[in-house]
């Protein structure tokens, strides 16, 4: 199926589902995408696929009608990060992210770089603590806080810098919504329908649990991309979310 591309300022789906594309071959990725409907989800392109296939892959997805979350987690000096974020906006992506650990000046520079794009600017979110990390991993880095405590500190900094939201674990979402407000977007990986394997994500929830926790956008990968009927899987997930709402 082929759909007309939409601009980043005019989303064609209200679904909170973002499907993570993790393919080694471009043709297989596009074959999967052609099985699903852009009204049922958005798509996430990460570092591996973007490194392999570049901006043209994003354009291919947009031409099929999908909003794209460019998940490159920029983390560099402020000027370099700002230029990278502006380049992502030029590409027309729906969402782009940076590492909150890059600091306030870096995040503010990224925010300012999007000002010229006005209503067409992508959502700018920050990564706090990767969902694969546990307390022991943070301790190895010299951080004595728990993942939730460290993440909350970074979330506070992110909001102070004027970004649109953060990537966080579903377990952290309840408190973050209470503390940082409904308008501050929460994007959560590690979301898997009941019965799915945990994979390399440590802090996981089902889509229904994530919605109840206050998650705005939930990233789902293999349970959809490896489904024998991904279109139906997406429809089932969205139907369950509507019942939960």
From Swiss-Prot:
The record ties this protein, via InterPro entries, to: Aldolase_TIM, OMPdecase, OMPdecase_AS, OMPdecase_bac, OMPdeCOase_dom, RibuloseP-bd_barrel
Q: Which reaction does it catalyse?
A: orotidine 5'-phosphate + H(+) = UMP + CO2
Q: Where does substrate bind?
A: 22, 44, 71-80, 131, 192, 201, 221-222
Q: What positions belong to coiled-coil segments? A: none
Q: Which GO BP annotation is one of this protein's? A: 'de novo' UMP biosynthetic process
Recorded hits in NCBIfam families, A to Z, give: PRK00230.1, pyrF
The name this protein goes by in its record: Orotidine 5'-phosphate decarboxylase
Give the source species.
Salmonella choleraesuis (strain SC-B67)
